[in-house]
Amino acid sequence: MSRRIHLALHPYGVGGPGQHGLWKDPSVAKDASIDIDYYIRLAKTAESALFDALFIVDSQFINATYPAHYLNRLEPLTLLSAVATHTTHLGLVGTLSSTYNSPFNLARRFASLDHISRGRAGWNVVTSFDTGTSRNYGLDEHLDYPTRYGRALESVQVVQGLWDSYEDDAFPADVERGVFVDPDKLHALNHVGEHFRVAGPLNLSRSPQGRPVIFQAGVSEEGRTLAAQVAEGIFAPGGTFDESRAYYADIKRRIAAAGREPDHVTVLINGSPVVRATDEAARRRAREIDEEDRDFDRSLALLGRAFGAHDFSRYDLDAPFPDVAHLAANGGRTGAAAIIARAEGEGLTLRQVAEAFAERPEPPFLGSPATVADSIVRWFEAGAFDGINLAFRNDEDLAWFVDAVVPELQRRGLFRTAYESDTLRGNLGLPFPENRHTRARTLVDAR
């Protein structure tokens, strides 16, 4: 089958990073981020448009300056379990930290979601960006990069091993023979590694898709390496056309170097299309959004999040950007380094850095339905992504994309007209993962 575009929906409730004014939008309920009906409604819309997945991001540290959605939101797997009962094909991808969760708990929770959804679960593996998270888990300091990413790799390996505890035909449930489970097809893990000692087995069988799909949002060097080693889906940062192409080429090269098939990893860039009947109407809408979000104090606070939730309000705004590189040593290092490089290279003050940090270039996917479809197709065919992780301002902005752009992509033969599978893995075009113990048994029998 020819290559087709994949789409995910990323809801931000009352407003994520940079969306300072969204909670004031009269069309957005003030409790949207904790209203399960909000998520169910969006999930049904996404499924009606044949999207691949609903993606729920998460973090576990806040202060009062954080984005509105972050201040009051639902835990991802609880949320997705509820959504699962109202959908039948839409993938359900949740973010959980490998730094602050044990592999056995991760394996059990995601396997449970995979069963509840009948094979539509995905785990977005993160190592936790906010350094303050450590203090919510009894640690004085956030773990350093090498430790966090080493732990993340081992965590995924352990979790996947636990997901293979039962072979796919381990439960004959043969009443006549009195055999519920075949003990030869139940396997302990007995993992002993640098970060974890996990015996297993997991008390939960494999799902219709074998196991949940592993996602990762690799931006740093360590993140890209981890993504290349284990990810089956990657949430890429987006940016310009050239930046996206460079990231895509780099990550696909790394996947191949890791001995994996690059076509079996779906790369989705973050994107917020602005669609209206004409290009000019879309530009007006984009200007409205920019005006709604214009808030210097909030932009300054958002800048602080890139440096460990640092409070920049106590500095002289018109002095040179302060020396704060050390504050991002264990979290958000790549983004912080880019900010510092620009500040030093252009001799910017703190005020200028905050203003530049809040700048929004014109969205690459902006205009009439045909214009937006043209841009998406150009990026896709040029090797900038396999799909887009979409975020929209409100229901109207989502409806413009669903009702006008999706049909345009379908007419061009680049987006599905029906789901290919009942599972997330199947809709992403990923192969079914054979149970490692079944594979080992097959190899022994073939000798």
Descriptions of predicted regions:
Residues M1-G18, S27, P146-Q209, D242-R245, ...:
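An alpha-helical appendage that flanks or caps ligand/catalytic pockets
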Residues M1-H86, Q209-P212, A440-R447:
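N-terminal beta1-alpha1-beta2 module of alpha/beta enzyme domains
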Residues S2, K44-S48, L80-T88, D114-R120, ...:
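Acidic (Asp/Glu)-rich catalytic clusters
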Residues L22-D37, T95-F104, D140-H142, P208-E221, ...:
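Active-site mouth loops of central-metabolism enzymes
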Residues H86-Y137, L143-P146, R151-S155:
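Hydrophobic or amphipathic alpha-helical targeting/insertion segments
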